[in-house]
């Protein structure tokens, strides 16, 4: 089979490079936004630009990857990231020119400047071309067997976490030079360029990126128009509603949405909780997330590889969601000890649940529609990210640590849906 002939490691390297470039800049994005005239709310809007525009770009790029090939669309996505960092670099080099002073009851007081607009454009452009996640998931589904799928998605998550480990560390080293934050941005530009070169020269095209055609319409130049027409006719039918009608897809994507909703509530509320209730500083918070990333590398790497050969994706999804519920419940007690105990549950829960869910989605979807379905899943996660990022801060302001109980309740919905997902699978002939 073609599955065994293509190495996954070039794709993992491309994913690592993409995450590394992003995590180089995110640690000091808040300081740049404030320096260019923004406030905390504008920072939140800046951070949400990526998922807002990915909401529209992800499904389109996913469908295109079914039609034109995974490699071509991954290349477009990576070029988009490269251009977005160029725009970001321009924002840091141009003078801070004021456009208008804004005093709003909703957005607060801030100054709209030219560099601030450039940063908004950069994050939006990266989002609209941000189909790399959905296309990478579809690519892995093309080249791996069902038996190895969960383990392979775990390795993809490991490459992501490694990027988030090394990126902030490298940013810290580069930003203390005389060039300040501009050097990490230049590094992000160069790293994105390396990603482009790796896709061009090291990543082969997936052998399963288009629909399985009958032999009589493959081959000659005269027949190429028939092939193209057939690809278009089938792919054009795979709109949002058609994908939602596929058996089992809506339930799986609902789980996607709920997981990312709970995650983003956590990632918004926890730093405030750590600063106000645990009395942590930036170094303590950085240590916490570094330990989490290291634990995730272990869980999603060797541990998941071992357990996925012994237990089903459905069992790992269900048990993982239960562990994440325990993580959020422990956070309510606001002690350092229980917070770090909860960290273990977070790593185990996320490490078992997320790769298993991606594996289930890829196995539920026919090969010819992997890109389209993965693209729609990106929209679900983007929408959940937008809602969670906005709601998390407001909820913590009103409910305090009870916000984590709300996140646990959301994940209890994931737990119930995963039980039904397993039952529906058993009922299939």
Regions found by a protein language model. Name each.
Residues 58-69, 299-312, 396:
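Helix-to-loop junctions at the C-terminal end of transmembrane segments
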Residues 1-5, 206-253:
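Juxtamembrane intracellular "pre-TM" segments in multi-pass secondary transporters
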Residues 120-161:
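Cytoplasmic helix-loop-helix junction between adjacent transmembrane helices
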Residues 51-59, 131, 164-165, 293-301, ...:
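Residue-level signature of mid-helix packing/kink "hotspots" within the transmembrane helices
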Residues 314-357:
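C-terminal transmembrane helical hairpin of 12-TM major facilitator-type secondary transporters
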Residues 79-112, 322-334:
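C-terminal ends and interior cores of transmembrane alpha-helices
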């Amino acid at each position: 089979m073609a599955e065994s002939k293509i190495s996954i490691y070039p794709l993992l390297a491309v994913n690592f490079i993409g995450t590394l470039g992003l995590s180089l800049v995110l640690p000091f994005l808040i300081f740049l936004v404030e320096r260019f005239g923004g406030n905390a709310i504008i920072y939140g809007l800046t951070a949400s630009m990526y998922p807002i525009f990915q909401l529209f770009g992800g499904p389109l790029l996913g469908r295109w990857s079914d039609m034109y090939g995974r490699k071509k669309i991954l290349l477009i996505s990576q070029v988009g990231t490269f251009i977005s960092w160029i725009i970001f670099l321009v924002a840091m080099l141009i003078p801070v020119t004021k456009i208008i002073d804004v005093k709003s009851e909703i957005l607060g007081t801030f100054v709209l400047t030219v560099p601030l607009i450039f940063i908004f454009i950069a994050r939006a452009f990266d989002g609209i071309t941000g189909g790399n996640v959905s296309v990478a998931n579809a690519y892995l589904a093309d080249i791996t067997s069902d038996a190895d799928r969960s383990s392979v998605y775990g390795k993809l998550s490991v490459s992501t976490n490694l990027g988030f480990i090394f990126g902030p560390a490298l940013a810290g080293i580069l930003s203390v030079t005389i060039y300040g934050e501009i050097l990490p941005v230049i590094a992000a530009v160069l790293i994105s360029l390396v990603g482009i070169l790796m896709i061009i020269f090291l990543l082969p095209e997936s052998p399963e990126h288009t629909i399985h055609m009958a032999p009589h319409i493959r081959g000659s130049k005269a027949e190429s128009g028939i092939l193209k027409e057939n690809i278009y006719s089938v792919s054009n039918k795979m709109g949002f509603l058609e994908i939602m009608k596929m058996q089992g897809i809506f339930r799986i994507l609902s789980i996607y949405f709920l997981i990312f909703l709970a995650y983003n509530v956590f990632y918004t509320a926890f730093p405030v909780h750590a600063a106000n209730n645990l009395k942590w500083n930036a170094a303590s918070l950085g240590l916490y997330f570094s330990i989490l990333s290291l634990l995730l590398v272990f869980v999603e790497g060797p541990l998941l590889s071992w357990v996925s050969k012994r237990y089903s994706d459905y069992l790992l999804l269900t048990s993982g969601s239960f562990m994440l519920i325990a993580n959020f419940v422990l956070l309510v007690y606001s002690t350092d000890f229980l917070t770090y105990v909860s960290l273990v549950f977070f790593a185990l829960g996320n490490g078992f649940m997320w790769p298993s869910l991606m594996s289930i989605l890829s196995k539920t979807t026919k090969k010819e529609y992997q890109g389209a379905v993965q693209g729609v899943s990106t929209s679900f996660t983007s929408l959940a990210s937008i809602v969670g990022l906005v709601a998390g801060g407001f909820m913590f302001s009103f409910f305090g640590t009870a916000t984590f109980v709300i996140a646990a309740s959301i994940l209890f919905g994931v737990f119930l849906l995963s039980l039904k997902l397993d039952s529906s699978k058993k009922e299939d002939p």
